[in-house]
Curated annotation (Swiss-Prot):
This is Cytochrome b. One of its GO terms (biological process) is mitochondrial electron transport, ubiquinol to cytochrome c. Heme 1 (or BL or b562) is low-potential and absorbs at about 562 nm, and heme 2 (or BH or b566) is high-potential and absorbs at about 566 nm. PROSITE patterns: CYTB_CTER, CYTB_NTER.
Length: 379
């Protein structure tokens, strides 16, 4: 009698994805982040569900409902902080996952890569809308500033912004629809993640060398299930350290002040994971130009497969490209720092230089480095 996991229609799918999946024998811990993202998403959906049971999406009661969750609901505080800091862990894993893809040339799996970019955009949209829900000062003004960017679109901009707002300013209608979208998007993300996995399993995983690994495969279970459990344990440890010791470390103190349309905070800034894009947006004096740069800073990932000029897939044996990659990482960290600083000298010029560097490294320096390495292969 054959095993039920290989014959049952549903079990067969699980088996082929997580048990008998042929995986390269040499994938490193950088390949853990996919499963960690799955854990993050599940955690966010579960904690979010329990928060939604007590939250009210009304401008008059939203702030106090969040306070009520923290003070009066059984373990409400831990659910709230797991959800808030879970978003930070989610983005750490996302950035690591994308960085891994860039370093090891995983972007040559076109469908998987493009679905991944859509997932990144969807996650960013979800996080932004979630940040608006507590209805603190930063929630309100963040929503006002970011939605206002759409008014830079010629001709239809103003109408579009008012349509999204559901009125002439960020108000009750805006909060209600943001809650609705924030609730539904994670389920769309989950569906997209399944498609992402479907496309990945058409080709199989890449590996650190970038060389096809068809001749050397091992079953996913038990080798990578145990490795994923270790990664998950470390993720939960990091998250709980954050939640139980410094839950407000990554938040903004301004968000503990209820939203007041008559009082603008001195420095409007998004959560830390958007600061790099915010710095790029602010570095361009023109509104439309800034918005385009903001979108392109993420959309540039679509071009990665077409900017790949190297004869080798991975950067493992390409020291010049490795240097370029780490300069890019340093540049992104610089942009993240600048995004949180006030708009004054010397931060303005540093932000502008870092923004120019960002696009220059990806569009010019990395392809040139690859071409030089191709020439060096002939030596």
């Amino acid at each position: 009698m054959t095993n039920i996991r290989k014959t049952h229609p549903l079990m067969k799918i699980v088996n082929n994805a997580f048990i008998d999946l042929p995986a390269p024998s040499n994938i490193s811990s950088w390949w853990n982040f996919g499963s960690l993202l799955g854990i993050c998403l599940t955690l966010q959906i579960l904690t979010g569900l329990f928060l939604a049971m007590h939250y009210t999406s009304d401008t008059m009661t939203a702030f106090s409902s969040v306070t009520h969750i923290c003070r009066d609901v059984n373990y409400g505080w831990i659910i709230r902080y797991m959800h808030a800091n879970g978003a930070s862990m989610f983005f750490i894993c996302l950035f690591m996952h994308v960085g891994r893809g860039l370093y090891y040339g995983s972007y040559t799996f076109l469908e998987t890569w493009n679905i991944g970019i859509i997932l990144l955009f969807a996650t960013m949209a979800t996080a932004f809308m979630g940040y608006v829900l507590p209805w603190g000062q930063m929630s309100f003004w963040g929503a006002t500033v970011i939605t206002n960017l759409l008014s830079a679109i010629p001709y239809i901009g103003t109408n579009l912004v008012e349509w999204i707002w559901g009125g002439f300013s960020v108000d009750k209608a805006t909060l209600t629809r943001f809650f609705a979208f924030h609730f539904i998007l994670p389920f769309i993300i989950m569906a997209l993640a399944m498609v992402h996995l479907l496309f990945l399993h058409e080709t199989g995983s890449n590996n650190p060398t970038g060389i096809p690994s068809d001749t050397d495969k091992i079953p996913f279970h038990p080798y990578y299930t145990i490795k994923d459990i270790l990664g998950a344990a470390l993720l939960i440890l990091a998250l709980m350290l954050l939640v139980l010791f410094t839950p407000d470390l990554l938040g903004d103190p301004d968000n503990y002040t209820p939203a007041n349309p008559l009082n603008t905070p001195p420095h409007i800034k998004p959560e830390w994971y958007f600061l790099f894009a915010y710095a790029i947006l602010r570095s361009i004096p023109n509104k439309l130009g800034g918005v385009l740069a903001l979108i392109l800073s993420i959309l540039i990932l679509v071009l990665m497969p077409f900017l790949h000029t190297s004869k080798q897939r991975s950067m493992m044996f390409r020291p010049i490209s490795q240097c370029m990659f780490w300069i890019l990482v340093a540049d992104l960290l610089t942009l993240t720092w600048i995004g949180g600083q006030p708009v004054e000298h010397p931060y303005i010029i540093i932000g502008q230089l870092a923004s120019i560097m960002y696009f220059l490294i990806i569009l010019v320096m990395m392809p040139v480095a690859s071409s030089i390495e191709n020439x060096l292969l002939k030596w």
